[in-house]
Amino acid sequence: MSRLKEKFNTEVTENLMKEFNYSSVMEVPKIDKIVVNMGVGDAVQNSKVLDNAVEELELITGQKPLITKAKKSVATFRLREGMPIGAKVTLRGDRMYEFLDKLIAVSLPRVRDFHGVSKKAFDGRGNYTLGIKEQLIFPEIDYDKVSKVRGMDIVIVTTANTDEEGRELLKQFGMPFQK
């Protein structure tokens, strides 16, 4: 069992029960899934770029990404409906906890001028979205093999009803929010 899952079962559940006065353990919010999305706009001209992005995303998450396709045609971007333009991975279960642990303990501290993640990136339903400017912060990525610096979106979906509950859940896991 991963370190964060164990922490959730022992400490986090108790702390949240006390803080929000839940009557049942089943009311305690938990992390449902983590979606890692990488939009690759350059894939329109060169499909090789998408292969590199997929490979990097697989290294980072340990799971094969799903290639996302364009929903609409946009003439200004030379984009046709159904063209591959990105990749995403949905993590659940143990892999999700492992990824979150790695993100909090290793990757985020490697960001340049890092002062914590924004407290305002909640969507009103307790889900948290985090944008990362470069994939180099992950230890699996070899600096010499990177052809282009790419960013990604990480969405942490929780079962929390409010942003306050979601924020407290992530804070208990050790998410470094700004002061």
Swiss-Prot record:
Gene Ontology cellular component terms for the protein in this record: ribonucleoprotein complex; ribosome
Record key words, sorted: Ribonucleoprotein, Ribosomal protein, RNA-binding, rRNA-binding, tRNA-binding
Any Pfam family hit: Ribosomal_L5_C
Biological process (GO), any one: translation
Coiled coil, from the record: none
InterPro entries: Ribosomal_uL5 (IPR002132), Ribosomal_uL5_bac-type (IPR020930), Ribosomal_uL5_C (IPR031309), Ribosomal_uL5_CS (IPR020929), Ribosomal_uL5_dom_sf (IPR022803), Ribosomal_uL5_N (IPR031310)
Record has Membrane as a keyword: no
SUPFAM superfamilies with a match to the protein in the record: RL5-like (SSF55282)
GO MF annotation list: rRNA binding; structural constituent of ribosome; tRNA binding
Keyword Transmembrane helix: no
Cross-referenced HAMAP family: Ribosomal_uL5_B
Assembly description: Part of the 50S ribosomal subunit; part of the 5S rRNA/L5/L18/L25 subcomplex. Contacts the 5S rRNA and the P site tRNA. Forms a bridge to the 30S subunit in the 70S ribosome.
Similarity comment text for this entry: Belongs to the universal ribosomal protein uL5 family.
UniProt function note: This is one of the proteins that bind and probably mediate the attachment of the 5S RNA into the large ribosomal subunit, where it forms part of the central protuberance. In the 70S ribosome it contacts protein S13 of the 30S subunit (bridge B1b), connecting the 2 subunits; this bridge is implicated in subunit movement. Contacts the P site tRNA; the 5S rRNA and some of its associated proteins might help stabilize positioning of ribosome-bound tRNAs.
Record protein name field: Large ribosomal subunit protein uL5
Protein species of origin: Staphylococcus carnosus (strain TM300)
Record gene name: rplE
